[in-house]
Amino acid sequence: MELDERRIAVSEMSDEELGALMRVHGIGLTVAEARRIAELIGRDPTLVELHVFNVEWSEHCSYKSSKRSLRLLPTEAPNVMLGPQEDAGIVFFTEHQGRRWGIVIAHESHNHPSQVLPNEGAATGIGGIVRDVDCMGARVIGTADPLRFGDPLGPNADRTRWIVSGVVDGIWQYGNALGVPNLGGDIYFDPSFDDNCLVNVVAIGIVAEDEIIHSAVPPQAHDEPYVLILVGKPTDDSGFGGSAFASKILDEEQQTQDRGAVQVPDPFLKNVLAMRKANEAVRTRARELGIVIGMKDIGGGGLACGSSEITAAGDGFGVDIDLRAVHVGLQGLLPETIMCAETQERYVLAVPERFAEEVLATYNADWDLPNVYEGACARVIGRVTEDEMYTVRFDGQIVIQAPVRVVTSGIEYEREERPRPFEGTEPDFAPPPDLSAALLTVLGSPNVCSRQYVYRAYDSEVQGNTVLRPGEAGAGVVRPLEGCDAAVALSVDGNPRYGLIDPYWGGANAVAEAMRNCAAVGAVPQALTDCLNFGNPEKPEQFWEFRQGVRGVADAARNLWLKGYVETPTPVISGNVSLYNESASGSSVAPSPIVACVGVMPDFARVVTVQLKQPGDAVYLLGERYDELGGSAYYSALGLGLGRNVPQVRWEAERARIYAVTDAIAEGLVAACQDISDGGLAVALAEMCMGPFGRGEVGTEADIGPVLNGLRADRALFSESSGFVVEVRAGCERRFEALCAEHGVKPLRLGETVDDAQLRVSAGSQQLIALSIASMGEVWLNGLVHILQG
């Protein structure tokens, strides 16, 4: 069989000619990269090969600028069942009915597509992350969505509001139809996201250890013939070039053209495939027959990435694919489009040839895919070989033939980094004459006000296993196994304003806050994932920001140890890197490392929420207040700029507080708990009084006099130094204080809960804040409504 006649004469062209030709074909490789490809395969590449390498060597797929830095992250721990080498990581959850169960977690970004087509971009982000978890053999039990948008009150307010509306609609329309509960997320607004919103997505699942499916051709393929089966929607041209698009700078003038790189979702087909239905039927039958299969989601890079990566992940395999066997939804598609389009709701399976007909019948007849979506089906598209070559045929010609590991291994750059000087200073200002009014201003500000306006559209209780819904605490909680009391907590965090000042502490604080939010509901942190959203790695100062962010995440994970294991890091078991979040004008997003944490609690009945429960309980502060208002909600709400003194994580004290809180909750000493972050101690107290709906009936009286230690009252109240506010049940104070002492934590009693629905804060005899819960709730609940509706 002949090689495709559409070869690119790399060896004969000048740099200018080669660069121009690749631009004509929409190939984003550099000239040097194209010449390197020719060297690696030993000849001039075909046009299809260049397209495939274009996606495989994109930043999105190859991590070519970030690989070296990612090695800083700790990925191993005694509880890790599968680290970050596949579509999702797995960490031990519990033993139940004689089986070991794991939590599966994946974390991705869909930033560029959501800026161009917000609804479709966000929806397909949810779809992709759910596939990542499903293809590990897991039952998907929850999602979360950390979102970053531009300034809703600035010069681009109309566009920002349009993007927010589209993203939120995409998330609920897809997630609700799919039947996966939304367990939480967070939202930040900042002008740096005007031209590049961030839509990060997290999904978690549950799987028995003996039912884990790997994204690789199994070793059994050396003993009997295996084939590749493509399942799902018919391939079209949607998302063609999507991975390359996600690896370039956004240009507003090209957004119309870029829309073709955004995929088209179909949650109803996904529901049939993923939600313990067709895919699970195939997996169950394989287990019954003692057959080992491989399964991989087809997302970024399309069939090219899915088929090559499942092959390369095996040991010593190649694959031979016939593109005419691929079911398509459009006639006349070129082979490069069939290979690289990112049509949604697709998987690739590696199964024994003797099992293939039964697999096809399960999808096509039992689950009737062709009638669920026109043209959807399962088809055998190729066979596994032992020559370690990646061979693809189309109409009698070989369009790709290269060593499979050359295709998938990508390249690696050592980028230049240069520290970015920060010129900001701490603002010099007189304390507000009315701290009650100042607190109301902060409570109504974009980055503090209630997110109920957004999450009320999400179905958080589908599946019937949700214990804590969005708004009830800083982490969502789900009880996934019937007859088992163990529960999983999920939190996501990362403050971009910290990253603007110091990306290292931005990364470290993201880890610490995610772990605190799990701890505050009673869950012991078990593992982390990260999504590293940064600017252009080819610019030394922006690459320095990225490196510092990674270092911050890594140092926090290493120093906030896994409970019960001295000096054993809390492992980072999955993640994603999103670079080139920069506009054509050269403006990049605020350095935004976003971290998710999963925690475990043995008894869901011990779970704790934010809202104060009953009068007469003691209220304690864990965590000293420092002059750390850099990047704070207080400075932002009062128009005081960024500041400089960003919160720092004091490893030993942070670790001690986290595990003191989880132990206290496990003993039943705690009625309510809130971590201290955005808005500081003042906002934490207010949120505990208000509860998720702004209508709490239990207030508190707090004396912060002993907290001040020379700090001005407003700085102590609004400092975002880390910590917790804890409501301790009446009669449990002595035991709580003793438990804290065992951890080396000094609890400071602020006061007690009261039954008059008021928040009163004083410093000795000086009253600082006196507000009704109703007045706070009105401002806090309606803040986002007013901001987004104009």
Give the ranges of each region predicted by the language model:
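Glycine/proline-enriched, intrinsically flexible loops and inter-domain linkers
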Residues: 1-790
